[in-house]
Amino acid sequence: MECEEVQAIVIDNGSSVCKAGFGGDDAPRTAFPSIVGRPRCTGFIVDMDKKDSYFCKKNSCFMGQKDLYIGDEAQSKRGILNVKYPIERGIITNWNDMEEIWYHTFYNELHVAPEEHPVLLTEPPLNPKANREKMTQIMFETFKTPAIYVANQGVLSLYSTGLTTGIVMNSGDGVSHTVPVYEGYILRQAILSLDLAGRDLTDYMNELLTDRGYYFTTKGEKEIVRGIKEKLSYVALDFEAEMQIASASPALEKSYELPDGQVITIGNERFRCPEALFRPYTGIHETIYNSIMKCDDDIRKDLFGSVVLSGGSTMFPGIVDRMNKELTALAPSTMKIKIIAPPERKYSVWIGGSILASLSSFQPRWISKEEYDESGPSIVHRKCF
């Protein structure tokens, strides 16, 4: 099967959300939580003669309850499930659950047979070699895909903007990365990772709300906190000045209605939460600067002039102006700073994958089943770079 004859499947597995769809499309067909849930209450069958008991997968406490829930269904039933994220800080850590998510993606979300479509998977910039091989192996041996490609998330974000040179700050739910790219080539020695992203900001917002007297303790309630963060937070251009405004008047306060109808009010928490992206520790602006300074002198100008923001944790209003201000203060005065923040940047990685998979010039880069059978999983290091 020639890869250009059928649409490729593009899957961007994030720490929090799985985005999937077809190469050549403008947006993913589906975006669902990257979670797997199993019932907390499971049954036991007891043999009174042998005084023995054993776990029975099919004997659940609730009639009709399944053994496994994935994505939105798992999210809606969090109260009765043990929920796990198979991807931690961008890296797949639970392969059995990851297989379940991929199965769900193919058959329940996209309604396709994976053996009929080439599959492009995204990977974080510092993905371990063993993980790249495992992804390749599972796609060929479990899902029988005819071809596969594993693509760097940072490069895909850059491609989504139409650029081949620039530095990407990709900040999702689990991890933030800077990836400098020059004429399509990743400058690997300058990739930097920051274990500060959306989930950390949600936890911080929860702390701020607790200080204000609002308590959210269960996993389900923490999803409410995430919603508050996403709907009401913004990045202050000048944090100290914004704090003074917030203390002097209620102008910055906003109300938020909880699912039970209760209305809460928050003020400076709105900008104090995403301020964690910039301080008190090494911020995303300093990480971008440090990454650029690890590159050769003669390309730094190009990188400072094409700073691409990508991922859900770059969606806060005000982040572009603040990033411009911070990088201008850090960079040499001769450097012109340009921040590129497409409105659809929450899905930039997936969009870049969709563009790449649909290019006729890309087709020879797929790893075919024949190549895999001949070389094994290590073929991924030779063809996907």
From Swiss-Prot:
Disulfide bonds: none
Gene Ontology annotations for the cellular component aspect, listed alphabetically: actin cytoskeleton; cytoplasm
Entry EC number(s): 3.6.4.-
Localization (cell): Cytoplasm, Cytoskeleton
Organism: Dictyostelium discoideum (Social amoeba)
UniProt-recorded Gene Ontology molecular function terms: ATP binding; hydrolase activity; myosin binding; structural constituent of cytoskeleton
Listed name of the protein: Putative actin-25
Family indicated by similarity: Belongs to the actin family.
Reactions this protein catalyses: ATP + H2O = ADP + phosphate + H(+)
GO BP annotation list: phagocytosis
The encoding gene: act25
PANTHER family: ACTIN
Domain of life assignment: Eukaryota
Enzyme class: hydrolase
SUPFAM superfamilies named among the record's database cross-references: Actin-like ATPase domain (SSF53067)
Biological function: Actins are highly conserved proteins that are involved in various types of cell motility and are ubiquitously expressed in all eukaryotic cells. Multiple isoforms are involved in various cellular functions such as cytoskeleton structure, cell mobility, chromosome movement and muscle contraction.
Record's keyword terms, sorted: ATP-binding, Cytoplasm, Cytoskeleton, Hydrolase, Nucleotide-binding
PROSITE patterns in alphabetical order: ACTINS_1 (PS00406), ACTINS_2 (PS00432), ACTINS_ACT_LIKE (PS01132)
InterPro entries recorded: Actin (IPR004000), Actin/actin-like_CS (IPR020902), Actin_CS (IPR004001), ATPase_NBD (IPR043129)
